[in-house]
């Protein structure tokens, strides 16, 4: 009988202690002394570090833990922003430090998913399978690890690819008033990455839920979600979640840049990230800072609002071969008020980025879509980020459009113009018309080169200005059906230093002449 009792006691001990960590641990525990507006003031957390996650454990009336980020470390208290609903947190509640900074899931499992800034799925497609996480904040790659930008990101938009080329690893700002097509440019760029070996991340900050749902619907309709991750922090989310959203998206992009993901059976190490938009991000950070009682500066923004965006955008890079050769290209979006690009946040982001695509409401209302102001827009990478073929045909285009702008301004004050000036103005109008492009219809590089070659070599001089876009669409349809070999020839020779090669020139000119002979646009 004694043996059975001892055996029973031994089993009970084993059952009690199995799976239980009996080692003593030091836990930094504090209490909530005040809470409100998404900010909790805590006492007793004397070992917490900046940006550390703090945990409000479950209690009566709350089944799950709530987390926050410690941002203000003061002499006798800590102020933390709460990531979630603060209604169940009360004065006197217990809070513990976790010893870790905020991290998000990264890697293959996120492709095709819509997540919140904490990496949690919000698309109703079940849990995300992931093997690792990354901290959302990280120091940008150093000078030694980087490589100069020399490979293009084809946006599929003629005006951008020809005049303001974007390279892999570049940071190109999209700036303009509300309703000028900023998001449309970004979405068209994502759609055009199909089959280009590029993973796209779309970060929606402070937008309406309906608008985010519309973007996701568009990406699904065109088959772009299979290589896209959407990070959504809508206007209904707390300012704290809107503040961390772009950093979370950037961490996901850095994982692709450094380690890559499998896409259509190939390892892809190039990522494109769209921050839509950083104006709302700055407003969310201003709200958080004012609630934390940080001293306000110009336009009530805190003093480190420049650093807010510079530390984010500097993480975009093209790594050299020694470090994997991956890239992270950033397209930040900024919304201006009444075309004022000299306001605080726009000037900050303009000075951080490698160029800007400036969209104007006047051009948009006049029917120029995309409403690109070619005069103010610039890419500091320039022709280095273009294929040889595009550089060859776009060189003339820039000069002729610049001439047209000067002559058009002069023509307003001159009553009668000579024939040469009239011809140049008409030519400029044709080129401007050629740059109009419907939304969700990005063009591959071979189609862009074919059209621009025809335009810059006087083949459109007899086509009336109102019929230019119809001529372009019909000509490209003719090339696709009757002469696919010409498109293939352009694509295969796009990197040739002597583009257009005699073979390409002969085939392309023959196709243009054949099309003109069989069609009438008078």
From Swiss-Prot:
Transmembrane segments: none annotated. ATP binds at residues 176-183. GO terms for biological process: proton motive force-driven ATP synthesis. It catalyses: ATP + H2O + 4 H(+)(in) = ADP + phosphate + 5 H(+)(out). It is a peripheral membrane protein. GO terms for molecular function: ADP binding; ATP binding; proton-transporting ATP synthase activity, rotational mechanism. It holds the Pfam family ATP-synt_ab_C. Its EC number is 7.1.2.2. It is found in: Cell membrane. Its main location: membrane. One of its GO terms (cellular component) is plasma membrane. The record marks 377 as: Required for activity. InterPro entries: ATP_synth_asu-like_sf, ATP_synth_asu_C, ATP_synth_asu_C_sf, ATP_synth_F1_a_nt-bd_dom, ATP_synth_F1_asu, ATPase_a/bsu_AS, ATPase_F1/V1/A1_a/bsu_N, ATPase_F1/V1/A1_a/bsu_N_sf. Keywords: ATP synthesis, ATP-binding, Cell membrane, CF(1), Hydrogen ion transport, Ion transport, Membrane, Nucleotide-binding, Translocase, Transport. F-type ATPases have 2 components, CF(1) - the catalytic core - and CF(0) - the membrane proton channel. CF(1) has five subunits: alpha(3), beta(3), gamma(1), delta(1), epsilon(1). CF(0) has four main subunits: a(1), b(1), b'(1) and c(9-12). Belongs to the ATPase alpha/beta chains family. Produces ATP from ADP in the presence of a proton gradient across the membrane. The alpha chain is a regulatory subunit. This is ATP synthase subunit alpha. It comes from Chloroflexus aurantiacus (strain ATCC 29366 / DSM 635 / J-10-fl).
